[in-house]
């Protein structure tokens, strides 16, 4: 992902204000509610029968934090996203058989959740930078599918 120095600074500043526990769980929860077919990958998570159940599910919150921690690691390796996400790409492709389109959907949901949490600090410039990164991460996660 190619980012200008200004975009990198905007990302770094914004990301420093993100609570991974809250944002990760909310992003994954929203994905599961808005795109219910994605729930089939989370059979072991228990009750996903309603939006309230999904958003309050401790396994959704815990896995959302793991997802956000991986994303955070990706922010440290923007010049090598494919390498950074190679093992996760292999897992999601070969073992879990996740449709790679779901990575793009999760990235878009994450941007919405970040906007909600960052409020006025989520400027158009910050949004543009995050959109580039989530697209790059989605492509890296889909890499083993090609």
Curated annotation (Swiss-Prot):
Residue numbers bearing the S-nitrosocysteine modification: 93
Q: Which residues carry this modification: N6-acetyllysine?
A: 59, 82, 144
Per the record, the domain of life is: Eukaryota
Q: Which residues bind heme b?
A: 63, 92
One GO cellular component term: hemoglobin complex
Q: Phosphoserine modification sites?
A: 44
Ordered alphabetically, the record's keywords are: Acetylation, Heme, Iron, Metal-binding, Oxygen transport, Phosphoprotein, S-nitrosylation, Transport
Name the SUPFAM superfamilies on file: Globin-like
Record PTM N-acetylvaline, positions in chain: 1
Xref: CDD domains: Hb-beta-like
**GO BP, one example?**
hydrogen peroxide catabolic process
Transferase in keyword set: no
Function description: Involved in oxygen transport from the lung to the various peripheral tissues.
**What do we know about how this protein assembles, alone or with others?**
Heterotetramer of two alpha chains and two beta chains.
The UniProt entry's sequence similarity note says: Belongs to the globin family.
Name it.
Answer: Hemoglobin subunit beta
What species does this protein belong to?
A: Otospermophilus beecheyi (California ground squirrel)
